Amino acid sequence: MRVVRTAQMELGEIDVSQIKFDLRSRDDIPKVLRGLQHLYMNEELRQSVFALLESEIAPKVSKRNGRSGMTLWSILVCGVLRLDLNADYDRLHELVNQHKTLREMLGHSLYDEDKSYAYQTLVDNVGLLTPELLDKLNQIIVEGGHALVKEGEGVLRGRCDSFVVETDVHF
């Protein structure tokens, strides 16, 4: 039984749209997480992504019976992070259990320090994102990005400062 994301937030849990990132950080993890935050906040895009995930991840397994397992949101976040960082499962295991902002993105509160992901759980669940499924997700997300760019269509203006430097170069 998989859910997209648990409907009831826990005490101390921060909504994905309210997570603050260090905008001056030059690391790639906050950039990836900001992209996922935009995906989560765009209702239409989020619905189409999760409709695809629900239909493609273990389609023969009953969605109503069994234990809950990882949420589809957690699988998506871990899979995107693993691919964008070109990380192996050992690094992903360390990140999802220790990185504070990533744990907020996965839906853990400040009081969930004792909750951690097992290595094999990550391997089994992130492995459900096949290359074919990732290609379909990529198409949906790129179309959403193109719609975002089309909203801001207008006159493009550019500025640059330039000057001519006289040089005496001999080859």
Task: Label each PLM-derived region with a short phrase.
Residues 109, 113-171:
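Active-site- or DNA-interface-adjacent structural scaffold in DNA-acting proteins
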Residues 50-67:
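Short, Lys/Arg-enriched N-terminal segment that forms or immediately precedes the first helix
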Residues 76-86:
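Alpha-helical support elements that line or immediately flank enzyme active sites
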Residues 66-74, 114, 155-156:
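Secondary-structure capping and boundary motifs in well-ordered enzyme cores
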Residues 84-94:
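Alpha-helix boundary/capping segments in eukaryotic regulatory proteins
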Residues 1-51, 55:
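Charged, often Cys/His-bearing segments associated with DNA-binding zinc-finger transcription factors
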Residues 92-108:
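DNA-recognition alpha helix
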